[in-house]
């Protein structure tokens, strides 16, 4: 018998999709058509790819007439070797955003729930809506402590999985790996840990992947490896969890350039160390400068800073003022962050331009 969706259910799905698209369309474009902007709103890494990585991309164009591997095996094996795992513990994706979408599809259905630390990556709200699921937003503890009790008991106990990022986006705060391990060890649920910014942090939970079958770790080459436009991401976890995701992954989900660049980055990871040192240095320089200008800046372990603006204005006002000066920063939809901006850390000239604009705006405010 052919199964059909009831009119009421169809209406609910369409209503949910309409709300998702409305929210997407309300966001300012993250890629302005005017190349004159200093772009500090999406945490991209503005440094050039190493020469060897660029050469791998050019060489891949010679194979543009061939389909890529449908199982990403070369890239998965390269990642497994680089991170001391086996290939069946690795899934490769068209950025970690594709992998997040797969996780929601694999583990959630209408009416299910997922627990997420809040504030967190806003994209997860849209993914939950698309699955007809509920997003349970659990507030971070004081001083960004991991609220283990709240995640293990209460409403979060019924969640299909727990999602958190370390370092966290948008705050940049970092949770000690011992606390992450305590959560994973005590939880009966899958714990999805997004480590998109981990190369700017003091430690990683990678060593826990072989210890716990309920930990799924996400990585991306968009932030610390300057490859956001090429779209390379990974998931590391137990073979059964990885297999469940790969079973619903589209064939040829990555192209030949993504494969080649991903393998090359893995082979040349050490060449990015200077890039990472520069970003950490600029992050501290900008933090100190903003603090002197009256901003309250959260200590960060990522390639961005969350800054609470001086009293009297909000984040939207500062975003608009900076945009008029061709500087793009992020404003945030999270409750309690209305008076904040998030600033990506780029090159020294970019950060000099940002600080000069902030000083100019601050001076104009004080003279009134």
From Swiss-Prot:
The lineage of its organism: Bacteria, Pseudomonadati, Pseudomonadota, Alphaproteobacteria, Hyphomicrobiales. SUPFAM superfamilies: PLP-dependent transferases. Pathway: Amino-acid biosynthesis; L-histidine biosynthesis; L-histidine from 5-phospho-alpha-D-ribose 1-diphosphate: step 7/9. The modification N6-(pyridoxal phosphate)lysine is found at residue 223. It comes from the Bacteria. This is Histidinol-phosphate aminotransferase. Belongs to the class-II pyridoxal-phosphate-dependent aminotransferase family. Histidinol-phosphate aminotransferase subfamily. GO terms for molecular function: histidinol-phosphate transaminase activity; pyridoxal phosphate binding. Its cofactor is pyridoxal 5'-phosphate. Homodimer.
